[in-house]
Amino acid sequence: MQEIQGKTRTVQELLGNAKYGIDYYQREYQWQTKNISELIDDLTNRFLEDYQAEHELREITKYGYYFLGSILISENETQKFIVDGQQRLTSLTLLLIFLNNLQKKQCSKKVNIEPLIFSDDYFDKSFNLVVPERNACMEALFNGECFDMTGQPDSIVNLVGRYNDIEDVFPEELKDEA
């Protein structure tokens, strides 16, 4: 029997240039507007506890952490799989895509968060959460393009809906600071 080991990780450590498969039995993304709103509110409140407008970008690394909850990963010789935490990691990826798109619109210094969203796989960029049926949708969101949801499964429609929720609930006062 395999031993379960707990480790505290940052988002960078968890998602940076990593690939995670999601087993077929838990691929449906089901978060609702309420879940996204709570996540954004929690992250915003935690961030604003430390934030000062005069802080340099590098000072953010000293800000307090927000606990996203337990995320269980199973690993074999060739692949990592998310056992628990798929909804949170998918939502976090949508938020990172949103923040990346905000940065694209700004002329100021940018933080390269793209490796948290996708990474090179033998010179081919692919998303860090490996769910092939989501690729076209995620690509459109990443590129800031409209995605035709005609005939798409509920999980894909839900992805687009939650991305739109992030756009709606993300605090205006932080959009320039993204």
Name what the model sees in each region.
Residues 2-178:
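Glycine- and hydrophobic-rich flexible loops that cap the catalytic core of alpha/beta enzyme folds
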